[in-house]
Amino acid sequence: RPEESSYQADMHLYMKILRCNACHERQPLTPPRSDIRAHFSSSGEDLGDEGRVPPALNGVGRKLTRGALKKTIQGAMPVRPYMNTRMPNWGDTHADILTEHFIESDLETDEKPTPRKGRENQVGRNMWGRALMGIDGLGCIQCHPLNGNRSLGIQAMDLKHSSGRLRAPWFRDYLMDPAKFRPGTRMPSFWPNGNPSLKGHGGSSERQIDSIWAYLNELGQSRLPLGMESKGDFMLKPERRPMVFRTFMKDAGLHAIAVGFFRNFHVA
């Protein structure tokens, strides 16, 4: 294993003193014990471990903005209302020290800006992002609430928090390969091997992800995605063409894919 930097060594010592690893995983520290993990619970249905176990802290200094990271350590930025375990408030001093150590340990110096400044012909567009979020796109709203509006399926994390919490380069890399950052996640990859699974809406993976980021940054002044504006009682009705709905079904499995046809014949 490569030798730890002074920031990493100090941070890991600090985490041990505060016992952060009693609830959070952060390599190379000892992860939470199984008997402790058994006490974590969730009020959300069908969210699995992601809904009950506090998130890992691997790379968190690259994931969260400085302000969001400090607020999180202070317990002042709860974004997982379904998680029954709550983050304590460690106060300003501990929060400042840990925030600095996380950022110095994790943040990369050669990050690409997103959207990419000076390359306006390749950056995202709000309208593409809105389309990708909806049921005729990638269907993000099937699992994620948006600005307080309920999702069509399970109630995972509200994406309204994304632009204020996350660093854009981390967001881009996470969407490309969610399982790399969170092994066992139910979040699918819509850009396998860097290639878009859906044509249009900017065309390239780079443009599509930038478009989603642009939409989330302008969420307060944008229309809701198709399927959420007038979702009614969450009934999805295929009309012109079959509709694909990724969800978690009791009899079909955790990564079920339901396909609805306009003649009331459906498969999963």
Which residue stretches match the model-derived regions?
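Long, helix-rich interaction regions
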Residues: 93, 120, 124, 135, ...
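The canonical Cys-X-X-Cys-His
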Residues: 1, 17-28, 69, 87-88, ...
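Beta-strand-rich N-terminal accessory domains
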Residues: 229-268
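A generic secondary-structure signal for well-formed alpha-helical elements
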Residues: 18-22, 27-31, 77, 106-110, ...
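Axial heme c-ligation environment in periplasmic c-type cytochrome domains
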Residues: 1-3, 33-62, 74-105, 112-119, ...
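Electrostatic cytochrome c docking/interface patches
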Residues: 1-16, 30, 108-135, 224-228
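Repeat-solenoid scaffold signature
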Residues: 2-21, 26, 152-161, 211, ...
